[in-house]
Amino acid sequence: MLPSATSLLRGPCLGLRAAALRLVRQQVPHVCAVRLMRCSSHRRGEALTGAPLDNAPKEYPPKIQQLVQDIASLTLLEISDLNELLKKTLKIQDVGLMPMGGMVPGAAPAPTAPEAAEEDVPKQKERTHFTVRLTEAKPVDKVKLIKEIKNYVQGINLVQAKKLVESLPQEIKANVAKAEAEKIKAALEAVGGTVVLE
């Protein structure tokens, strides 16, 4: 571009900026920082107290330091007991983990007092796996029971199944899902066996 064209393009922009600055200066009153300091409510000799410096180390009382050392030396079981005792002593309720966004829309409301009392009672964990144990067999139905046991015990022949039935109580199957354990129990009881799920 030519120098004259460049000066023409800059000219109107600079003119608009100057006009805008003049307009702002007319509308905004000038505030003097010194005048603000003189009008403040602080006394002249008093230093302004600011926030404590973040990089300055905080001094803790010896009692607090000793508590921290004692807690740090506890085992996990002792920490669990300490946590439980503190909750009881300070009457703090167990609170589940909150989602990151806070309350989830449509979530269940917080439990009321009767429900909270039910939570204090330890719930028995429902078992999902069982051991099927044959405890008794009717002498009349031994043949049917031996054949049925052969179906459920892997790698066993009729002679081994007969010895198993003659030396009761015996474990038929271990670590079986609840549905399968119930199925085995029903089948063995149908042919004259007495079965216990453990």
From Swiss-Prot:
Two mature forms are produced by differential two-step proteolytic cleavage. Cleaved by the mitochondrial processing protease to produce the long mature form and subsequently by the mitochondrial intermediate protease to produce the short mature form. The modification N6-acetyllysine is found at K125, K138, K142, K144, K150, K163, K173, K178, K185. This is Large ribosomal subunit protein bL12m. Residues 1-36 form a transit peptide. Component of the mitochondrial ribosome large subunit (39S) which comprises a 16S rRNA and about 50 distinct proteins. Interacts with NOA1. Residues 106-115 have a biased composition (Low complexity). Belongs to the bacterial ribosomal protein bL12 family. Residues 106-126 are annotated as: Disordered. The modification N6-succinyllysine is found at K150, K162, K178. Keywords: Acetylation, Isopeptide bond, Mitochondrion, Ribonucleoprotein, Ribosomal protein, Transit peptide, Ubl conjugation. As a component of the mitochondrial large ribosomal subunit, plays a role in mitochondrial translation. When present in mitochondria as a free protein not associated with the ribosome, associates with mitochondrial RNA polymerase POLRMT to activate transcription. Required for POLRMT stability. InterPro entries: Ribosomal_bL12, Ribosomal_bL12_C, Ribosomal_bL12_C/ClpS-like, Ribosomal_bL12_oligo, Ribosomal_bL12_oligo_N_sf. It holds the Pfam family Ribosomal_L12_N. It comes from the Eukaryota. GO terms for biological process: mitochondrial transcription; positive regulation of DNA-templated transcription; translation. Signal peptide: none annotated. One of its GO terms (molecular function) is structural constituent of ribosome. PANTHER family: 39S RIBOSOMAL PROTEIN L12, LARGE RIBOSOMAL SUBUNIT PROTEIN BL12M. It is found in: Mitochondrion matrix. There is a cross-link at K150 (Glycyl lysine isopeptide (Lys-Gly) (interchain with G-Cter in ubiquitin)). It comes from Bos taurus. The gene is MRPL12. GO terms for cellular component: mitochondrial inner membrane; mitochondrial large ribosomal subunit; mitochondrial matrix.
